[in-house]
Amino acid sequence: MKKILNMSLLFLTLINLGACQKQDINLEPNIIKDQYRTYYEIFVGAFSDGNGDGLGDFKGLYNRLDYLNDGNPNKGKDLGIDGIWLMPIMQANSYHKYDVMDYCSIDKDYGTMEDFDKFLNEANKRGINVIIDLVINHTSNLHPWFKEATNAILEADYNNKYVNYYSIVKEEEKETNKKYYEIGSSGYYYEGNFSPVMPELNMDNKDVKEEIKEIIKFWLDKGVGGFRLDAAKFVYLDDTKRNVEFWNWFMDEVRKIKKDAYVVGEVWNASTVIEEYYQAINCFDFDMSQNGGKIAYTANGNISVNEYVEYLNEYRNIIEKSNPNAILNPFISNHDMNRAAGYLKDEKMKVAANLYMLSSGNPFIYYGEEIGMKGSRGISDNTDANRRLAMLWGDRDKVKDPEGTTYDSSLQTNGTVKSQLRKKDSLLKHYQKLIKVRNANPEIARGKYTPINFEDQFYFGGYLSTYNDSTIGIFHNTSKEEITIDLSKYTTYQFEKLRSFIGENEAKLNGQILTIEPYTSVVLK
């Protein structure tokens, strides 16, 4: 028996998303209050300078909220995101802030707690869920806990409670898979797998867990919507079982305060390992990211669209075995990776955006990705800073690149926010349209996949996505050629005849025959 779907075509052209159309496309936001969002990762120190000192801060971020989400979903001039991930904001000794000195503070470079509260309150008013980076695998070596612990060791005061806050051992107790550093000439060593200035906390210590509970409560009580968990697989190095147990404990504590908090972990590993972590937390999908990931490979024509769709379906099946409510978290790049515009050229940046922004779950956009910012590691040390360059606003914002930057700014050839807002076919306008389509069609983020097998096609593929008895079809053409395809050869679903659209890249549906222009994705409803 054939299912008859009421199908209307919402097309996302990769060259001209702002073109006039003969009929109105329904892009009215369908707001559902749940955990599904479009997130935007921000390195506060490089985003926007609100006081003129060259450093990004919360005053600057507050001033840029209209760019991200102006609070009026019908106005349509903002990016349209409804989630923000803030990289570490607590007092630290480094530019990147992953070495926390005080867990209940705002780093002085970013302003005051009052500045943060003002930003957070306004973001919440606009329906933006703000999650913050939580770095609890390790602290700074300048944290008062560690200072107390090392002073106690040097004074042979081994019963001091802070000694047991950290993983501190004698020579004969050192494990070969871990990195250690001696405390003076004491014969005692602390674990520091990331850096000698980042000593590892001892999560077997009940006092440490009590401290973590207080940290969780402090930020959730302020109105933070959840956490991004840094180094989630390193709490117990090379021990997935104990890590999952720890994060289950953590989530129990989170839910005591905020049942709907969104928590996503950094587990940079294969899907077989990530599957286990989904028993406790949501995780980022690293297999989709970077130059060799599924998104870039599909956009650049290294693998077929059909293979990409098969991967999405298989990955979702894997994580949903661990947790029926598991949420996919796709992304192209983040602060630890070379920026995508370095390996995705021209239209391929838009193709890649379509692939992950039209997938299920919560996509994460790395700040500047929507304007094609570039940045990659250099030859010298400390060049992760090149991946965290100052946002290119194109106005009087004085925010500067972080310390350690060696990137040649002349390589930034894709323009600024200001220039792209003026250009109707810009990458920024493309992202704006994509997010509108996501917000108007809840089936995209929340739907259950039914893959359609296009195994005889390479540059064309797609699937059905069903949510609350409403089904949409999502199809991609990643090639430079127009493709005409009879959908009835691949699926028993029937689609309504489609009105034509005006634009440089037009998509047409004639009966069951779909004609889709180059570098175009369509949503059928």
Q: For the regions a protein language model found, what residue spans apply to each?
A:
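Loop/helix patches that line or flank the sugar-binding groove of alpha-linked glycan CAZymes
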Residues: D34, F331, Y343-T484
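Beta-strand-rich binding/interaction modules
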Residues: E482-G503
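C-terminal beta-strand-rich structural cap/linker in extracellular carbohydrate-active enzymes
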Residues: K508-K525
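Sec-dependent signal peptide recognition
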Residues: K2-L10
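Active-site-proximal helices and loops of the catalytic beta/alpha 8
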Residues: L120-E122, G127-I128, N137-H138, H143-E155, ...
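Acidic/aromatic-lined carbohydrate-recognition and catalytic surfaces
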Residues: C20-K213, D221, R228, A232-Y277
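Beta-sheet entry/capping signal
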Residues: D82-G83, G127-N129, G225-F227, D260-Y262, ...
